[in-house]
A protein has these predicted regions:
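Gram-positive cell-envelope targeting signals
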Residues: 1-25, 77, 131, 223, ...
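Conserved C-terminal helix/tail region of periplasmic/extracytoplasmic solute-binding proteins
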Residues: 279-303
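Pocket-lining segment of extracytoplasmic ligand-binding domains
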Residues: 75, 153-244
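Short, solvent-exposed loop/beta-turn-alpha elements that line the ligand-binding surface or hinge
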Residues: 115, 190-199, 266-276
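Secondary-structure end/capping motifs
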Residues: 213-288
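Short acidic active-site motifs
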Residues: 57-58, 152-154
Length: 303
């Protein structure tokens, strides 16, 4: 019954998004993969209004300013806004960390990272900064840290090198574990919580274009409510989100999607409620946020 109610709520809110402003259709963009899960159960019913792009091209979505909403890394949106290259305000955080430390090593424990080589992905990114912070705060000191380009590359190393210790991300981790049952994984979020008390870090957010806020305020509010409901389904109805993600080609298959989604830490927290944690994450490496904390006007507040 709870799943049915959630499905009905998402459907009604999605319809409201379109109906609340006559003849106005909300459009949205997101990087394909885990961040796009926040939109999946909405987008599957109106795919023509949603664009899913490669993660490395998300800055171009801000530059083009075509979409009303964009899901993107929090720091990317903050940095572009500070530089005056974006008018998109942060409406809410939707992704709270999908990073995992993994290895095929027999009886692998986090303490095994001490004095060992660890391979991360995304050098000079906020994800890497958070991992290094979490390790340091928990007294874990690798002998060396090396970097590969992305989670797909560390996943490949995890599968081919039985001695490797890597940081990868969902859903790549689940796909790897389905191929090799010897893999053991630990959530970076657990280390982060031990160090900070926070349930994950502010990884990706929903951004809304200032022009749309001014021209279609009710449509904006309705869409944000729909996204919040969609995010909730990632916890309450994983099957629905998995089916939607596969139909939209966000994730490869239902089996991987169903197992990976719980580890993607998808949940909606509005801008004002998330601000404290956004600023905490930013202070780990302010250079990733343009050298300063986001200003007050970066945050969307419904009137």
């Amino acid at each position: 019954m709870k799943k049915l109610i959630a499905l009905i709520l998402v459907a009604l809110l999605a319809l409201t998004c379109t109906a609340c402003a006559e003849a106005y259709t909300i459009t949205a963009s997101a990087p394909s993969g885990a961040p796009a899960l926040a939109l999946a159960t909405i987008a599957v019913n109106q795919p023509e209004n949603f664009t899913f792009v490669a993660a490395e091209t998300i800055s171009a979505e801000f530059a083009s300013a075509k979409a009303d909403f964009i899901v993107a890394p929090v720091n990317a949106g903050a940095k572009l806004y500070k530089m005056g290259k974006s008018t998109y305000k942060l409406a809410g955080v939707v992704s709270w960390g999908n990073l995992y430390i993994a290895s095929q090593k027999e009886n692998f424990h986090l303490e095994d990272m001490n004095g060992a080589k660890v391979v991360l992905f995304g050098e000079n990114t906020i994800n890497a900064a958070v991992v290094n912070y979490a390790l340091a705060q928990n007294g874990i000191v690798p002998a060396s840290v090396e970097y590969l380009a992305g989670a797909a590359q560390t996943q490949a190393l995890l599968l081919t090198d039985a001695e490797a210790i890597v940081v990868t991300a969902e859903p790549a981790l689940t796909a790897a574990m389905m191929k090799n049952a010897a893999i053991t994984a630990y959530a970076v979020n657990d280390l982060y919580k031990a160090a900070t008390g926070y349930e994950g870090y502010t990884q990706a957010a929903l951004f809304v274009k200032e022009e749309t806020i001014q021209a279609q305020p009710e449509a904006v509010k309705a869409f944000i409510e729909a996204v919040a409901a969609s995010c909730e389904q990632a916890t309450t109805d994983v099957e629905a989100v998995a089916n939607a993600a596969v139909a939209l080609e966000i994730l490869p298959n239902v089996k991987v999607a169903t197992q990976a989604i719980p580890g993607c830490a998808v949940r909606f927290v509005n801008a004002l409620d998330a601000r404290e944690q956004i600023e905490f994450t930013a202070n780990i490496d302010l250079s990733q946020f343009g050298g300063a904390l986001p200003a007050d006007d970066f945050y969307y507040v419904a009137e």
